[in-house]
Amino acid sequence: MKTNCVVKLGQLRRTDLRPAALILGRAMRDNPVNVRAFAISDAERRSRALERFFRPVLLGLHQRGLIYGAYRGNALVGICGIARPGFCQPTPLEKLRVLPAVVFGNPLGAALRVVNWADAWAHRDPAGPHWHLGPVAIEPSVQRQGIGSALLTAFCVHMDAYGAVAYLETDRRANVHFYQKFGFAVVAEADVMGVPNWFMSRPGGHPRKG
């Protein structure tokens, strides 16, 4: 699929997950919850820690859902993860795979903070069927060029085609306004480790006919 910001969208393969984790590490380096959870003051070290963390996270999500990428030429520049209804939360095996990435090479207490963060989000996960959006990230050097909007537009087209409910979490106020443009509304707010978080839902539309 081509978009008006000259990118192509496609589903990621397992071999694409490492470059996707690199993008997440760079793009989400300064997200407030990530800063608080990993407690690494040096930005580059924090970026590398997040890359290690997201490798097993993406592997699990790849098995439970879909991960779409945005490409310029052959370069991956954005990702959009989606968990299928009923498969939002990581399995016990996934949690074990993530554990070394948060225990080794990170400050003492990082693992416990990540667990508390994950539990806080899981506790608020809607009971009804829904597609769970996230993570969504764009390579920092090409942000604000319409790539995120292209990914979200494609996501919403799929949701509307099935009349499906979508749900997400974010720790950035700017993201709240971004997602509202695509029909999401805030359904709850809470502090997670002292960081404001917003929980958003998008109602299911009418399935397309034909």
Residue ranges and their predicted role:
Residues 1-18, 22, 26:
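Conserved N-terminal entry element of GNAT/NAT acetyltransferase domains
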Residues 48-69, 128-132:
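A short helix-loop-beta-strand connector motif used in the catalytic cores of GNAT acetyltransferases and
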Residues 63-80, 139:
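Conserved beta-hairpin
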Residues 76-137, 143:
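Conserved acyl-donor/pantetheine-binding loop and adjacent beta-alpha core of acyl/acetyltransferases
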Residues 129-131, 158-171:
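Conserved GNAT acetyl-CoA-binding A-motif
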Residues 138, 144-157:
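Conserved acetyl-CoA-binding loop-helix of GNAT-fold acetyltransferases
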Residues 149, 161-162, 172-189, 193-196:
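Conserved active-site alpha-helix within GNAT-family acetyltransferase domains
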Residues 164-173, 192-210:
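C-terminal "cap" of GNAT-fold acetyltransferases
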